[in-house]
Structures are given as structure tokens and as C-alpha cells.
């Protein structure tokens, strides 16, 4: 009977065949231990010399790392393993023998591993991170579908930039200029006027020359836009979403979190409502903590965000940033028009901003004024301005960076480990 490592638990004391790769092995004179993986998990195969044909035991000792195999044997309980079971191997069939696999069991430097990212993905820890990434995506769709959102796919090639910055990848679109999308927000706002609540999930591109552990050039973003929703209501949806994702990973990725040695007690504390601190109060807090490199009207750097998040040891919303450091489309704060109705959600443990969101300007005259103040081409944003001409309503939106969120939940040091093939400042290969 053919099965997988994950499904093998349903076949205790039965003979099964599993297609797998050999990740490592060790042997004594009488027993060989094969570390097997098949994409669904990792399992040990035990080959006892006295219980198999001589050729099988010889093969078990000689087979090379990352060779592909069909392994047949009996699934037995083993409380010492992460899975709780292993295979007593009876026969081995080599599908393809690997030669001189470059990533050996010894330690390798990061650059070497990134050069061999196509192979590094096979390792136990990298496999665990990708499984957690997959669960975050699955839980995302579950949350938005259950809450009545419609998925919309905004274009990746655009003629304008929602952030109004110069950090764009430029390309030619026949005889026109085009850019790789920084965000689908403007298109999602249009879709929200048709469907009420919408979300998207796709790649975004930032031509930022950043080399921090938080930054990728290409990353995936989950964005939501909601009509007839105010800023406070949007924050509630955001914290419910993040809490749902964290709980889903805790429930469905126990083994992966164990492999990564993640301190799950920190994740178990994540619950609504999240703490909130205004930008003004955050500045005062940082001053009281001895930070003299930040003044009102300046954006926070990584050390500032880390200090604020560590104070709460939970995801925390920093709200109502100064108007001058935020994009043109954010709604003024009626209590202080020098600030806007926005919030960044900062993850604890130094992972930084994972969500940025705001209430959007819904008044045509004000939005036209903002477009001019930011030096933007009004014609390029004419479709966006149309949304305020024809039945404008209060509405809000936000975007969550997938890789930073996965890094935080997984506890990995750098976001490069949370993308299958990360695009970094000096890396376009593999």
C-alpha cells in the first residue's frame, strides 16, 4: 500500500510503501537509521541487518544524501520521535541516486545557503517555515471568506503609485510608462464601492535600497478595503484577523513550531483587543526611555518600533501619525488635523510593522487638494477621484505583509527565510 509520511500514522503495524528522499543517515554494524522526507513530513526508517536481505542492508549503508527512493516497511510506534512513529524498513528501491549534494549536514554560511536556495528549501527548518507560511495563507482566506469579503485581483502593472513615491520599478508598456505595483489599494477601493468588502493577495514590489532583516524587494501582501467602515471598526477587523491567523498556526502547525524551537507562549498571549498608543504618546514614551534621536513629525525607525512593541510584549497599534509623513489618501483626524486616522500594527520581538492601514479621504475637494499638495498628476488619478464623485462613502483599508508576519510567527531571524525564493537588494538568483 502506497502512502505518505503524514498519513502513515493511520497504518500502524501495517506494511506500506513511501516515496521519499534521504536527508541523512547513520549506521552501526547491525542497524542503519535513514532520515526520510517526502514533502508531507520527516520520518526515520530503521534497517536491521538481521531482518533484511544482505543487499538491502548494504544499500541502506551506501545510499547517498538526497537520493530518491521507494521505501517499504512496517509502521511502528516510537514515542521518541516527533511524529510518534517510524518505519521498520524491509526493502529499498532507488529511483535516482544523488551525487555530491552540496548542502551537507555541517553548518554553512548564509550566502552559500542563499546561492543554493533551491536546495536549502528541502531542510527541516526551511520546510517548517514554508508550512507555516502556507497555513497563514489558508487561514487568511478562511477569515475573509467567512466574514463576507470578496476576493479581487488588482493589476500588477500600473500607471500610478498609491504611495506617491519614487521607489518604483519602471518598465515600458508598449509606448507608455508603467510600474510594478506597490499596492493594489486604489483598485481595491474601487472594488469596495461595488462589493462592500474586498480583499486581495498578491506580490508587491518596492525599489528600496534596504538591507535590513525586515525588508524584501518583492513581497506578498494581503490587503482589505471596506465600505461604510470607520477607523475604529477597521482596527477591530485587523486585530481579529491577526488573532485568527496566529491561533490557526498554533493549532495546525504544532510540529513545525517545535522544529523551529519557537516559544509558543508568546503567541498564545495574542488576543483581542490589541493595545493602542497614539503617535503623540509614543513620542513621549520614547523620550522617557532615553531616545533622543526622534522628534515629533519624524517617522519611527526599527529601534523605536521595537522599544514600543517590547513595552507591551504584544502586537500594538500606533495610531494617528502626522499628516506630513503619511500618503495623500488618508483621512484627517477631526480631533487634530495635523494628524491622520491611520494605524501601524507593530509586531513584538523586533519584527516591526506588519500592517499599515487608514481611513481614506472620502471628500472629493479634499482629495483633489491632497493630490496637488503631493505633486501628483491629477489625470493619472482621475479614476480614483471618480470614486468620490459618484456616491462616496466612509471607507477604510489596510495591508499586511505576509513575509514579516510569517517571520514573527515562526520566530526566524530574517524575512529572507519566509519567501521560497526571496528577492533582496543584491540577489535575483535563484
UniProtKB/Swiss-Prot annotation:
Instruction: Name the SUPFAM superfamilies for this protein.
Output: Class II aaRS and biotin synthetases, Nucleic acid-binding proteins
Q: Where in the cell is it found?
A: Cytoplasm
Q: Does the keyword Hydrolase apply?
A: no
Record field: transmembrane = none
EC no. given is 6.1.1.22
In which domain of life is the source organism classified?
A: Bacteria
Q: Name one GO cellular component term.
A: cytoplasm
Q: Which GO terms describe its biological process?
A: asparaginyl-tRNA aminoacylation
**Subcellular location, principal:** cytoplasm
Q: Which reaction does it catalyse?
A: tRNA(Asn) + L-asparagine + ATP = L-asparaginyl-tRNA(Asn) + AMP + diphosphate + H(+)
What NCBIfam families does the database record attribute to this sequence? asnS, PRK03932.1, PRK05159.1
Q: Which family does it belong to?
A: Belongs to the class-II aminoacyl-tRNA synthetase family.
Protein name in UniProt: Asparagine--tRNA ligase
Q: Which organism is it from?
A: Staphylococcus aureus (strain MSSA476)
Amino acid at each position: 500500500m502506497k502512502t505518505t509520511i503524514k498519513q502513515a500514522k493511520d497504518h500502524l503495524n501495517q506494511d506500506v510503501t513511501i516515496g521519499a528522499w534521504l536527508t541523512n543517515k547513520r549506521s552501526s554494524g547491525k542497524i542503519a537509521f535513514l532520515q526520510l522526507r517526502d514533502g508531507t513530513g520527516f520520518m526515520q526508517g530503521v534497517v536491521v541487518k538481521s531482518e533484511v536481505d544482505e543487499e538491502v542492508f548494504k544499500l541502506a549503508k551506501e545510499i547517498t544524501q538526497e537520493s530518491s527512493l521507494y521505501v517499504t516497511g512496517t509502521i511502528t510506534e516510537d514515542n521518541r520521535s516527533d511524529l510518534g512513529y517510524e518505519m521498520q524498513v524491509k526493502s529499498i528501491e532507488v529511483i535516482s541516486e544523488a551525487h555530491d549534494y552540496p548542502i551537507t549536514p555541517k553548518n554553512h554560511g548564509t550566502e552559500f545557503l542563499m546561492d543554493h536556495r533551491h536546495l536549502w528549501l528541502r531542510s527541516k527548518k526551511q520546510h517548517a517555515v514554508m508550512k507555516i507560511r502556507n497555513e497563514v495563507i489558508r487561514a487568511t482566506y478562511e477569515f475573509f471568506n467567512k466574514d463576507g469579503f470578496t476576493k479581487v485581483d488588482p493589476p500588477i502593472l500600473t500607471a500610478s503609485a498609491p504611495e506617491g513615491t519614487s521607489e518604483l520599478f519602471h518598465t515600458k508598456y508598449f509606448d507608455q510608462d508603467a510600474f510594478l505595483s506597490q499596492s493594489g489599494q486604489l483598485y481595491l477601493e474601487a472594488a469596495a464601492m461595488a462589493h462592500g468588502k474586498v480583499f486581495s493577495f498578491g506580490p508587491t514590489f518596492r525599489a528600496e535600497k534596504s538591507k535590513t532583516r525586515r525588508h524584501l524587494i518583492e513581497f506578498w501582501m494581503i490587503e482589505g478595503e471596506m465600505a461604510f467602515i470607520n477607523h475604529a471598526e477597521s482596527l477591530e477587523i485587523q486585530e481579529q484577523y491577526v488573532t485568527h491567523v496566529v491561533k490557526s498556526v498554533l493549532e495546525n502547525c504544532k510540529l513545525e513550531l517545535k522544529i523551529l524551537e519557537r516559544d509558543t507562549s508568546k503567541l498564545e498571549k495574542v488576543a483581542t483587543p490589541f493595545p493602542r498608543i497614539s503617535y503623540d504618546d509614543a513620542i513621549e514614551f520614547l523620550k522617557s526611555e532615553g531616545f533622543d534621536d526622534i522628534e515629533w513629525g519624524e517617522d519611527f525607525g526599527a529601534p523605536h518600533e521595537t522599544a514600543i512593541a517590547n513595552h507591551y510584549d504584544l502586537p500594538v497599534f500606533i495610531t494617528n501619525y502626522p499628516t506630513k509623513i503619511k500618503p495623500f489618501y488618508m483621512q484627517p483626524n477631526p480631533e487634530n488635523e495635523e494628524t491622520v486616522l491611520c494605524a501601524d500594527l507593530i509586531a513584538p520581538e523586533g519584527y516591526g510593522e506588519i500592517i499599515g492601514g487608514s481611513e481614506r479621504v472620502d471628500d472629493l475637494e479634499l482629495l483633489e487638494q491632497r493630490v496637488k499638495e503631493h505633486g501628483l498628476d491629477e489625470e493619472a488619478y482621475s479614476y480614483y477621484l471618480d470614486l468620490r464623485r459618484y456616491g462616496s462613502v466612509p471607507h477604510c483599508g489596510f495591508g499586511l505583509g505576509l513575509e514579516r508576519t510569517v517571520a514573527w510567527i515562526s520566530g526566524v531571524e530574517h524575512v529572507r527565510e519566509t519567501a521560497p525564493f526571496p528577492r533582496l537588494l543584491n540577489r535575483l538568483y535563484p
